[in-house]
């Protein structure tokens, strides 16, 4: 199985340095990963480093809590795309979902998608904080909002992707959206199992180790 184009090569830790971001991009070019996934401060630098390659740039929005206003998320998206982002990973308004304020959750996603235009938008759901029913509802709303992906986790909460959650998400979105598994994908075997469960993309800081058949224990 050729995994490279499944991988969003990720570096989101708050103490990431310019040298580490350069290494991330160099590795993404070498292994021809789908995208690098970074915070917005680094987007324009990644654009410069990745110019002329097939590697995209995923920018996180409302990260990692998802609890900022809709207007803030939309502004973040506009700035990210202006700086060179090709894909957006937005964090769901988790509190609003738990309060069953589904209208706000939907409008939040729609506003991000509107700001993103033709760019791919993934909704990060933070499944470890959600019930099975909440995961299913969030997937349904993401499809209604026209988002291209649903995503399991930020990698910054209690736990990351599970095979069971990926299967559940895929069963809800079917062919209407894709699924991204993130957090805890550390080995080639993990990656294979996630893909078999229904994942179309993998968010991991260990893309190089995974491709080489090693285990990654680096922070996200």
From Swiss-Prot:
GO terms for biological process: 2-deoxyribose 1-phosphate catabolic process; carbohydrate catabolic process; deoxyribonucleotide catabolic process. The active site is at 89 (proton donor/acceptor), 151 (schiff-base intermediate with acetaldehyde), 180 (proton donor/acceptor). GO terms for cellular component: cytoplasm. It comes from the Bacteria. GO terms for molecular function: deoxyribose-phosphate aldolase activity. Pathway: Carbohydrate degradation; 2-deoxy-D-ribose 1-phosphate degradation; D-glyceraldehyde 3-phosphate and acetaldehyde from 2-deoxy-alpha-D-ribose 1-phosphate: step 2/2. It catalyses: 2-deoxy-D-ribose 5-phosphate = D-glyceraldehyde 3-phosphate + acetaldehyde. Its main location: cytoplasm. Its EC number is 4.1.2.4. InterPro entries: Aldolase_TIM, DeoC, DeoC/FbaB/LacD_aldolase, DeoC_typeI. It is found in: Cytoplasm. Keywords: Cytoplasm, Lyase, Schiff base. Belongs to the DeoC/FbaB aldolase family. DeoC type 1 subfamily. Catalyzes a reversible aldol reaction between acetaldehyde and D-glyceraldehyde 3-phosphate to generate 2-deoxy-D-ribose 5-phosphate. This is Deoxyribose-phosphate aldolase 1. The lineage of its organism: Bacteria, Bacillati, Mycoplasmatota, Mollicutes, Entomoplasmatales. The gene is deoC1.
């Amino acid at each position: 199985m050729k995994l490279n184009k499944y991988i969003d090569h990720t570096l989101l830790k708050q103490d990431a340095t310019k040298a580490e971001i350069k290494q991330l991009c160099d590795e993404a070019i070498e292994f021809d990963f789908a995208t690098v996934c970074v915070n917005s401060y680094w987007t324009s630098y990644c654009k410069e480093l990745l110019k002329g390659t097939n590697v995209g740039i995923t920018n996180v929005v409302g990260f990692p809590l998802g609890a900022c206003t809709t207007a803030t998320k939309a502004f973040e998206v506009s700035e990210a795309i202006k700086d060179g982002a090709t894909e957006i990973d937005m964090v769901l308004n988790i509190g609003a979902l738990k309060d069953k304020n589904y209208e706000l959750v939907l409008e939040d996603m729609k506003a991000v998608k509107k700001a993103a235009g033709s760019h791919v938008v993934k909704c990060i759901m933070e499944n470890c904080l959600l019930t099975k029913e909440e995961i299913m509802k969030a997937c349904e709303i993401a499809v209604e909002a026209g988002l291209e992906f649903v995503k399991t986790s930020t990698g910054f909460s209690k736990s990351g992707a599970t095979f069971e959650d990926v299967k559940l998400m895929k069963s809800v979105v079917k062919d209407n959206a894709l699924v991204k598994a993130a957090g805890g994908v550390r080995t080639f075997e993990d990656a294979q199992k996630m893909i078999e469960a229904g994942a179309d993309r993998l968010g991991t800081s260990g893309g190089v180790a995974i491709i080489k058949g090693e285990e990654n224990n680096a922070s996200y």
